[in-house]
Amino acid sequence: MKADKPEQQVVISGVGQSDIGRRLNRDPLELTLDACLAAIEDAGLTTADIDGISTYPGTTAQPPGFTGAGAIDVFDALRLELGWWSGGIERPGQLGAVVDGAMAVAFGLAKHVLCFRSVFEGSAQGAGGRAAVMPGGDGRKNVPRASGFMEWVLPYGAPSASSWIAMMAQRHFYEFGTTSEQLGQIAVNARKNAALNPKAIYTDPMSLDDYLNSRVITTPLHLFDCDVPCDGGTAMIVSHVDTIPDLRKPPIRVEALGTALRGRPSWDQWDDLTTMAMRDASAQLWSRTDMKPSEVQLAEMYDGFSFITMCWLEAMGFCAKGESGPFVEGGERIATQGGQLPLNTHGGQLSAGRLHGFGFLHEACVQLWGEAGDRQVPGNPEVGVAAAGGGPMAGVLLLTTSR
């Protein structure tokens, strides 16, 4: 394996997660701190050891509930003494915060960086659902003038990513013969895995017929193709390899990473509507390691909408371009027990809740440490990927317990 990349000076030493719920109605900073303190303890560290902090998206103006706390909030609440910190939304996807932390560690700006993401979208939306927190959600009055990308979608009644992703999925259906029955396997697999996750939002059994009979949101996407807003926080500690003797348990090494910002900063103006920025992020990742897709034993990949996961499967080389439909058909290849590539083993955002990217990295680490309980992938997996992002931005990490 190549050993000359900065990310290979980095390990994940601990992870933590708060309570997760559809609507917890708790102080979002409290949820954030629960996750951060759990991650610090998991690594065998104390707050005095943390000398860096990184988060996405910080406290930037976003729909209510989109962010639970910023870097300064956590810095102050935990009384940290930092040599480096970062927080913001203009990154290659949600995991850009972890990539930033990894680079800070690799280049000597910090030894232990606390990376976190928290949301309280479920409580913020309340009974009004997503429309309650979207610009112009009342549809009649107090609608601000659209600007930027929204100028081109809001007048046509398409302010939601479901509309943009549906357009891409429709093109994939047309070009490659992908079917709703195939797409539905992403959601059915997620629900099956969520049933074994005590923190998952939705755990009731769901058949493919249940999926197909659910209401259509934007053709071809059904209700269960869309992730579930929730409340919760997730955190992880990124540490330098030189600190391994000080850690509580064997660390997870970052073998390679990939990031990308491609095309126009929108979701609808692409050279190829059947793919997204994960095509380029994945190519970058594989160029930074001698490992191959066939060596990956589990994949935790973004499912804000189920079609995004299919794009990740193709981009990462787990199947050929246009072949994600046949790859997931029947669900056997992506099953946690006995599957060729166990996929979204915690239930993903479709059933476990929209922790907005960080939940995938948390689950990959839990699995590689063998701490996933009833949903544990058998055979002591040593290599996994965690990926987040869609549209023009994407980030992915290749993780291993040995090098």
PLM region descriptions:
Residues L24-R26, A124-R130, A195-K199, P265-W267, ...:
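Short acidic, glycine/serine/threonine-rich loops at helix termini
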Residues M1-L29, A38, Q185, V216-D280, ...:
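Condensing-enzyme catalytic core mediating Claisen C-C bond formation in acyl metabolism
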Residues I89-V119, S162-L196, M236-D242, A352-A372:
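Active-site-proximal alpha-helical scaffold in enzymes
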Residues D4-Q8, T60-G126, A131-W164, Y202-C226, ...:
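Conserved catalytic cysteine-centered active-site region
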Residues D272-R279, A283-S306, M310, A315-F318, ...:
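Extended C-terminal subregions enriched in glycine
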Residues A61-A69, W267-W270, D303-P326, M393-L398:
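Short glycine/threonine-rich loop-to-helix capping motif typified by GTGT followed
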Residues T47-P57, W84-I89, V113-S118, Q182-N189, ...:
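Beta-strand segments within the central parallel beta-sheet cores of soluble alpha/beta enzyme folds
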Residues M1-G93, D100, A104, M168, ...:
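Conserved active-site "lid/cap" helical segment
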